Amino acid sequence: MTKRLSPQLLIYGYAQGIFPMDEDGQIYWYDPDPRAIIPLDERFHVSSSLQRTIRRQTFEIRFDTAFRETMQACSERDETWISQEFIEIYSQLHAGGLAHSVEAWQDGEMVGGLYGVGLAGLFAGESMWSKARDASKVALVALVERLRAGGFQLLDTQFITPHLATFGAYEIPRAEYKQLLVKALQCSATF
């Protein structure tokens, strides 16, 4: 348990393979076993219906234009681990070029997106939100394309969900995750 977060502490945590969550004002660090990842190779799967949505250009995808708003939208649910303190600290990481958002816009309004932390060749996906069908899914596809182009090695989703499994996300043992993390942290990648 930690009382306060700082950008430096977050960076240290991600480099160790742990991540924080706020529970009732207390910050706890997690290191799940197994750990979920999304493959950045040919195993990443996009359904044919989502491919059609992408081809129709239903959404305009933007990167890093509404980071704080993306985090705020991710926090607006019945149960959340994203406190205002988290929004402040991750926004500092964003200002330093280490936290990023992918936003789906429609008719001038942000209707979905995601955010996470990029550290060397690791991208730790933190949360997604959507108020328009497929908006966050299209944002995730755009994220994977961006990570591939930038030379990222590892897309950490922390936990598996049925939603992420449709993209090919899978679980690996903690020890295997730590090995992949070491390799990812040794490479240079650009968001």
Swiss-Prot record:
Subcellular location: Cytoplasm
Catalyses which reaction(s): N-terminal L-lysyl-[protein] + L-leucyl-tRNA(Leu) = N-terminal L-leucyl-L-lysyl-[protein] + tRNA(Leu) + H(+); N-terminal L-arginyl-[protein] + L-leucyl-tRNA(Leu) = N-terminal L-leucyl-L-arginyl-[protein] + tRNA(Leu) + H(+); L-phenylalanyl-tRNA(Phe) + an N-terminal L-alpha-aminoacyl-[protein] = an N-terminal L-phenylalanyl-L-alpha-aminoacyl-[protein] + tRNA(Phe)
Pfam families in UniProt: Leu_Phe_trans
Similarity comment text for this entry: Belongs to the L/F-transferase family.
SUPFAM superfamilies to which the protein is assigned, alphabetical: Acyl-CoA N-acyltransferases (Nat) (SSF55729)
Example of a GO MF term: leucyl-tRNA--protein transferase activity
Name under which the protein is recorded: Leucyl/phenylalanyl-tRNA--protein transferase
Biological process terms in GO annotation: protein catabolic process
Organism: Herpetosiphon aurantiacus (strain ATCC 23779 / DSM 785 / 114-95)
Predominant cellular place of this UniProt entry's protein: cytoplasm
Keywords for this protein: Acyltransferase, Cytoplasm, Transferase
GO cellular component terms attached to this protein's record: cytoplasm
NCBIfam families reported for this sequence: aat
Summary of the function given for this chain in its UniProt record: Functions in the N-end rule pathway of protein degradation where it conjugates Leu, Phe and, less efficiently, Met from aminoacyl-tRNAs to the N-termini of proteins containing an N-terminal arginine or lysine.
EC number annotated for this UniProt entry: 2.3.2.6
InterPro entries: Acyl_CoA_acyltransferase, Leu/Phe-tRNA_Trfase, Leu/Phe-tRNA_Trfase_C, Leu/Phe-tRNA_Trfase_N
